[in-house]
């Protein structure tokens, strides 16, 4: 009904989004402008008409809406559609395609101003603690390893009692990161809430912008990959989370290359058992 009140250019935008919603979640504003023959300023005005700050906010909400409207009954067991006739190579290609798609989706969903804000907080923090349970806890351990190699103090915590105790002991100047694909893991949400109340800078890494986890976060980084209820071990989710952490890590190294190099050499020497 609202389409009738829109300009012709805005109507083209609306019709394109309705026809190709998932493609829009992986498009830049320039892509959408080109496909609809509407100026980028028109795209932004269209998003603001719908109540969003801009295209990035609209795109995030659209991706979340597409993910949550999937029927639970049709939730797949695997990331890729695998048939009985697929051989090992064919399955490998499908998994490769899954990872490629989810990384493109994640790059489009990330708000780079939020990313740079997290990098700045990490550069100046006293310590960083990463909270996550289950598969997200394993991802947190990987980031802990990366940060230790470049000299940042902190830990990855997945035991809920340890998470709560550590979170409440944080203070201003510390950073707490919560990893949860759904953004609803109660242990991780509670840990980030305690950390925020203690004065720490809080960061959420999740697929769900409207989640309880993001409500407790100063910065919310959105990773891609629509995941079904049966996919707690999803390779797409794991790749998306690792991509976000690797982006933060790479930007940290870029910002202080000499410090990163010195810390890496010291930690490498410490691990050399032949000395």
Per-segment meaning from a language model:
Residues 1-3:
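Short, Lys/Arg-enriched N-terminal segment that forms or immediately precedes the first helix
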Residues 6-11:
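Short helix-coil-helix linker/hinge
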Residues 12, 19-26, 30-113:
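HTH-adjacent hinge/linker in prokaryotic transcriptional regulators
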Residues 12-16, 45, 61, 102-105, ...:
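Alpha-helical scaffold segments in soluble metabolic enzymes
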Residues 113-125:
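Glycine-rich phosphate/diphosphate-binding loops that line cofactor/substrate pockets in enzymes
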Residues 123-243, 249-256:
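Glycine-rich phosphate-binding loops that contact phosphosugars or nucleotide phosphates
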Residues 258-275:
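A short, charged, Gly/Pro-tolerant segment at domain boundaries
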């Amino acid at each position: 009904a609202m389409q009738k009140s829109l300009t012709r250019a805005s109507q083209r935008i609306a019709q394109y989004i309705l026809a190709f919603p998932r493609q829009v979640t992986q498009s830049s504003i320039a892509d959408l402008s080109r496909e609809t023959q509407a100026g980028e300023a028109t795209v932004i005005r269209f998003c603001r008409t719908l109540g969003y700050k801009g295209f990035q906010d609209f795109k995030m909400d659209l991706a979340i809406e597409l993910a949550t409207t999937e029927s639970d009954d049709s939730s797949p067991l695997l990331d890729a559609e695998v048939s009985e006739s697929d051989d090992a190579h064919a399955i490998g290609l499908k998994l490769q395609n899954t990872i490629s798609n989810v990384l493109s989706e994640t790059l489009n969903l990330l708000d780079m101003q939020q990313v740079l804000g997290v990098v700045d907080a990490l550069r100046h923090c006293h310590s960083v603690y990463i909270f996550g349970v289950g598969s997200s806890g394993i991802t947190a351990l990987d980031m802990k390893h990366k940060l230790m190699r470049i000299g940042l103090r902190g830990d990855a915590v997945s035991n809920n009692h340890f998470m709560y105790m550590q979170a409440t002991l944080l203070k201003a100047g510390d950073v707490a990161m919560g990893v949860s694909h759904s953004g609803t893991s109660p242990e991780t949400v509670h840990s980030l809430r305690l950390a925020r109340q203690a004065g720490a800078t809080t960061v959420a890494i999740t697929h769900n912008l409207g989640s309880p986890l993001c409500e407790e976060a100063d910065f919310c980084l959105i990773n891609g990959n629509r995941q079904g209820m049966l996919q707690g071990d999803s390779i797409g989710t794991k790749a998306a989370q690792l991509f976000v952490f690797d982006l933060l890590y790479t930007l940290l190294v870029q910002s202080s290359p000499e410090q990163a190099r010195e810390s890496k050499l010291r930690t490498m020497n410490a691990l050399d058992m032949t000395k």
